[in-house]
Amino acid sequence: GGRKLKKFLAFFLVLLVGVYFGVGWFAYGQAASVPCDVWYEEANNTPSNWSLGTKADWDPSDYFISSYEEVTILADDGEIELNSWWVENDLSQPTIILLHGVTSSKFSPDILLPMGMFNKSGFNVLAIDFRDHGESTCEDGFYTAGQDETDDVVAAISWLKDKGVKSSNIGLYGSSLGGLVALMTPAKSDDFGSIAVIDPPVDFKTLVREEMAYQGLPTFLWEPIYHYAGTVSYTHLTLPTIPTV
């Protein structure tokens, strides 16, 4: 009787763990997946001609950029191709790397507007699509709360330095997830001079809970998401990766 009870308890424990991680896998897939594409309403945007869409109703044409270059930046030893837009004015002037939000891309007016503003100020500008976003390599269709995306920024910094841009003249500008990535980048590189962020999430647990509530999922699923991400996907959602300044 005792041996049967132990076998039953062991089986039940394995089943319980399997269900727990299965729930985590499903919820993680819902909360962290990204489309690996450009949003259809922004697909025709370019630095030389773009629309604000439903964000505003004024004419942004003063911030159009007539001359720009489409470039590919390699990350992860060439395994990741980052589709980017490069505008060179004067390499002795500041150069800004623009970082978009989650599920967004460089095609968004949230990137194109500041890109045009920086250009009008005589800055050089580089707008990248993170991996699994826009026209960059679709690695697995998930974002990693900045842990892999920071590698994309490091690759962009290296690309600029290869062009002769001084580290002290490189600035990071990020909004939403891009802001979080900018704040995390110093953990991997200090080859830049400044950071400006708009609305960055710094409490990822709260962010995931809010995203789950928005998608109609119960927020208590955060726990299996957290453990699935860390154990199976090696994405540690609450690591203190934003360095203290």
Which residues does each PLM region occupy?
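Short beta-strand element of the alpha/beta-hydrolase
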Residues: 93-101
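Hydrolase active-site cap/lid region
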Residues: 184-233
